Amino acid sequence: MAFLDDIAAALGVEGLDERGIEALLDLARDVAHGTERKNAPLASYLVGIAVGKGMGMQDAVGVVTGFAKTDD
């Protein structure tokens, strides 16, 4: 995905692989449908912060998805 690769290069960070892209898109869907739509990009941002601090992406996504699926 040239767009995401270009952004990653400009930010000086590692790009996303297909598994990471799929996990983040699934996260955005689950958050948007399980809470409010506006929470999807914000939750993705928080996952990025957690990953930047050393948490595994799948673990961070799992934590956030758990909140999205239990929100009433």
Cite the ranges covered by each PLM segment.
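Amphipathic, hydrophobic secondary-structure cores in small proteins
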Residues: 16-52
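Long, contiguous binding/interaction regions
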Residues: 13
